[in-house]
Amino acid sequence: MAVVPIRIVGDPVLHTPTSPVPVGADGSLPADLPELIATMYETMDAAHGVGLAANQIGYGLRLFVYDCADDRRKAAHRRGVVINPVLETSEIPENMPDPDNDDEGCLSVPGESFPTGRATWARVTGLDAEGNPVELEGSGLFARMLQHETGHLDGYLYLDCLIGRHARSAKRAVKSHGWGVPGLSWLPGEGPDPFGH
């Protein structure tokens, strides 16, 4: 269990759909999964993230951890893990996202954020760390996180959801940082925090 590097946009593992976590006939999960989950929590916490998908640290498995409020202004957070999540959402708006209310960032695009259109409500079903069924739903920031993390597991970054001038700004930012190529990562807690925490 340790803080590990987070892959940056351009790494193939971020752009490849993940594989389901194997579940035994008796409902058992892989014996090494608790160690991976602990590493994911520790890395997410060190990065001050609200969620972290396994492929962001190089594991092509379908699970994410989260520590997220329902609303940006609320102090109470929900924390947990979802294994093999299935996502359901309300309709995603087709209009331009609001720069004040729809801003979104990503640990794999460190220090950047862009307005991103997302459904206002989302639900995921899957398994918890013990292999028990879990269902999470929410609106606002929590719904945004559920969509963001499940998108990672499907091989997409939030940059892939951007439209118009926001998409163009993101492409310029990726190019200016020298991202978009394999092998780049950053280690939370080492050097300046790209998000200013």
Swiss-Prot record:
Disulfide-bonded cysteine pairs: these are none
**Which reaction is this enzyme known to catalyze?**
N-terminal N-formyl-L-methionyl-[peptide] + H2O = N-terminal L-methionyl-[peptide] + formate
Biological process GO terms, please?
co-translational protein modification; translation
Superkingdom assignment: Bacteria
Query: Which Enzyme Commission number(s) are listed?
Result: 3.5.1.88
Cofactor field: Fe(2+)
The UniProt entry, under Pfam families, shows: Pep_deformylase
Q: Does the keyword Protein biosynthesis apply?
A: yes
Matching CDD domains, A to Z? Pep_deformylase (cd00487)
Arranged from A to Z, the UniProt key words for this protein are: Hydrolase, Iron, Metal-binding, Protein biosynthesis
Sites where the protein binds Fe cation: 106, 148, 152
Q: Where is the active site?
A: 149
HAMAP family in the cross-refs:
Pep_deformylase
What NCBIfam families does the record point to?
PRK00150.1-3 (NF001159), PRK12846.1-4 (NF009483)
Protein's name in the database: Peptide deformylase
